[in-house]
Amino acid sequence: MKRNIKLIVSCIAFIGLGIGIIGAGVNYFFNHSVLGMEQGLAGSTQNSNEANQVCYITPENPDADMTLEDTTEADLQAEQYAQPETLLGQHTVSLGTCVFQQKKIACWGDSITFGYGYSDEAQLTNGGQIMDISGWTYPDTLQYYTGMDVYNLGVSGETSYEIATREGGLTMFVAKNVTVKAGKSVEISIVDADGNSVMLDNFNGYGGDNNQAENLVYINDQLFQLGKRDEKLYIKTYGNTQKGSVKLKKGMQVTTQAAHDVNADILVLQMGSNGGWDSYDELIAQYQAMIEKSGTQCYIIIGDTDNPTEAYDSEQYESDIEVGTKDNVWETALREAFGEHFINMRAFMIEHGLETVGLEPTEQDLDDLANGRVPEQLKDDYTHFNSYGYYAMGAAVYQKGVELGYW
């Protein structure tokens, strides 16, 4: 009996010691977040939730965002995956260990999403090791941070109308009856819901993840291939399985291959800098159509990254400095429409871009910052980022996803 009592007392003491150690560990975690940066995106996201404890994401601190307040019951039940080491150039960098449910992320956008202008050579320091981010885009960075499947569905030069059409938010239809014979091409007309002719440069929809055959679309759940000649559109069946003729009727919906195949849990949208909209309300309606088509309410809206006087709505502004890191007219409209789902990416890049990738500001950067402009070291040209800029952009998207509880 006494022996049993001693055993029980010992167990209680051991449990108490364990709880004390865990408590000390949790306390250390909260008091020693890298760089002590609790505001994260708050400077560039006016409506951020003050209850969230947020740290900047830096190369030294890819997991600094994990807080108990943000942990949901689903997170606690999710399987813990030890992320494998990823070979980056000649250096192996550990991704660490994160808790998440395996999800898919679809990044739809234009050349900014595609990653036009990424650097041939770009390196930063990660945990004392050199990390090669040459050629990285923001979806690459997002995949690095989350460990999830990320689709780069960016196409250079596309307008917001074209992106929304490619994603399926704005629908396409067969304009008139046509018969497609096996192995033969026939002219076809495709229109939108208003009857306007549709001619996309990329009908398969995959953009940066374009390892598929060109211009594949689904009509009535059958795969077809489109071709262009003399400003006309032609269609034929895809593959060798079709033996007879296929009759396509007027009004049948046409869906890009990517819109058909990619059923993402999380949507990240970036568009508008190439036009395709005549009012902020029209652009917002395009975003909303894409969100509705996706079937998910887990989405992030990335604000335009151009300096105000170089943006699509540049006539609204006399100088960049008058706007600074405040929301401009365009950003205000998006924030009012989408609330906490919106990132003022331009302001983030001004306030935190250089710090996120560990770059010291040059004289030109300091001049840019003083005049409310995105630092030159992050850019390839006036509108596109280099890999440092895209890395910082991806880190900001990751942080927003943390705030929203997406990963």
PLM regions and their residue ranges:
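Mobile gating loops/cap/lid regions near enzyme active sites that modulate substrate access
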Residues: 347-373
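Catalytic phosphate/metal-binding cores of nucleic-acid and nucleotide-processing enzymes, i.e., regions
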Residues: 108, 112, 143, 265-266, ...
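Serine-esterase "nucleophile elbow" of acetyl-processing enzymes
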Residues: 46-263, 322
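Substrate-gating cap/lid alpha-helix
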Residues: 69-70, 78-85, 90, 291-293, ...
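Structural recognition of the beta-strand scaffold that forms the well-ordered cores
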Residues: 104-113, 149-154, 265-271, 298-303, ...
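Histidine-centered active-site loop/cap adjacent to the catalytic His
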Residues: 150, 163, 363-407
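Gram-positive cell-envelope targeting signals
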Residues: 1-63, 67-70, 79-80
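Surface-exposed cleft-lining segments at the edges of enzyme active sites
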Residues: 269-282, 305-306, 315-319
